[in-house]
Every structure is written in C-alpha cells, then in structure tokens.
C-alpha cells in the first residue's frame, strides 16, 4: 500500500510541475522469455545520480500501476528479484533479468529535481512468447 501512495503522490506532484529538465527513455524494447532487457532513463540536465532518486513504475494494459524501484536501486516489497535498478554511465537503468511474458508492459522512470519528480515518456517492453 505504501508504494501505491508513493505512486499517487508522484503523479500529483508532477501533474502541475514545470521544469526545464526533460527525462527521456527508449520508446520501445523487445525481448524473449528468459531474456534480459535494460531500460534507461536520461536527464537533459546532465548525469543522473543517486540524488535524483530514480523511481521505476510499471503500467500493465489494464492501467494497473506498480512501483518497482525507488531511490535508484531499492526494490519495492513483493517485487520479483528479476527487476533491479542501478546507474549505468550517466543514466538510471532498470534491468529485467529472465523476463517473463507477464513483464510485457509500459515502464516509466521518474527523476527528482530539487522539489518535484519529472517523468519520462515511458518504455513499452514487449516480451515475445
């Protein structure tokens, strides 16, 4: 439930926020069952750091949102270990290791800038199977 509250808070904070920062993600990625896929999240302001508290949120086709990762690398309770968050170079990353067909979804990154989060446009992950 705490993660649901976090997601709702993030959406509320970001809905009216204006920022010069732009967060970009790959528009789409494809993998096979059992494969590994790495999603990245880039900031227009420079390198993403732990101070950006990267969050990763999954949206299933039925519009069910699930918080996966908070604070760059902290997996939410109940989230499978195949999901991991990290920094790779100057970007935040979400790695899905051993992808399953149920991981076919949209994934959104949100980065913290001073006093609000800025969301990326989302990455559609397709798991062929």
From Swiss-Prot:
Arranged from A to Z, the UniProt key words for this protein are:
Adaptive immunity, Immunity, Immunoglobulin, Pyrrolidone carboxylic acid, Signal
- Stretch forming the signal peptide: 1-19
Q: Name one GO biological process term.
A: immune response
> Disulfide bonds, which pairs?
none
Q: Which segments constitute the Ig-like domain?
A: 20-125
Q: Which residues carry this modification: Pyrrolidone carboxylic acid?
A: 20
Q: Name one GO cellular component term.
A: immunoglobulin complex
Q: Does the keyword Transcription regulation apply?
A: no
In its miscellaneous comment, the UniProt entry states: This chain is from a myeloma protein with anti-DNP activity.
Protein name stated in the entry: Ig lambda-2 chain V region MOPC 315
